[in-house]
Amino acid sequence: MDQLQQSLLDAPIIEKNGYHYFVHPISDGLPKLDPTLLREIVIRIIRKAELQDVDRIVTPAAMGIHISTAVSLMTDIPLTVIRKRKYGLEDEVAISQQTGYSENEMYINDVRAGERVLVLDDVLSTGGTLASVLEALDGIGAEVIDTVAVIKKVGGENKVDDAGYDVKTLINVDVVDGEVVIVDEHGDS
């Protein structure tokens, strides 16, 4: 069993507004993120993602940053972070981020029409964040070459699927009776 799978099986579960969440180093920054787990994830992303001719990696703040930074370092592909703070720059595009538990504004800067991007994120749950990001990138005119989320939480609404976007994942899980259940140890391809 790989580290990602074992770390998910060991993850504590919390409930917030009737929604069950696993607490995991990749999605929450705790418990501690072991470098060997991060390395395993980065290697799996590099093997799974379409990287040919990608101009930049794009990731939403905050929990996609550590994953995307490591992938950027390994591939020499520049990184742009979609921020939760407005800067008011000329090319700034505001997007509405709707998750299972909140709604916020996020801001894309420095992504231009025609750029070929790889979108990376930590978790695909309701799909609200990734659907908003992918729609905004389409609106900018960027070409999304591939989208990868480390963990997919199955069951329930998925706005990414509903919007017709394809997202690769490294592992698919569900939360059943207060425990993480591995649905697909290889994720979606």
Swiss-Prot record:
Top EC class, one word: transferase
Enzyme Commission (EC) number: 2.4.2.-
Cross-referenced InterPro entries: HGPRTase-like, PRibTrfase_dom, PRTase-like, Pur/Pyrimidine_PRTase
Domain of life: Archaea
Zinc-finger is among the record's keywords: no
The keyword Glycoprotein appears for this protein: no
Function: May catalyze a purine salvage reaction, the substrate is unknown.
HAMAP family, A to Z: Hypx_phosphoribosyltr (MF_01467)
Protein name, UniProt field: HGPRTase-like protein 1
Source taxonomy: Archaea, Methanobacteriati, Methanobacteriota, Stenosarchaea group, Halobacteria
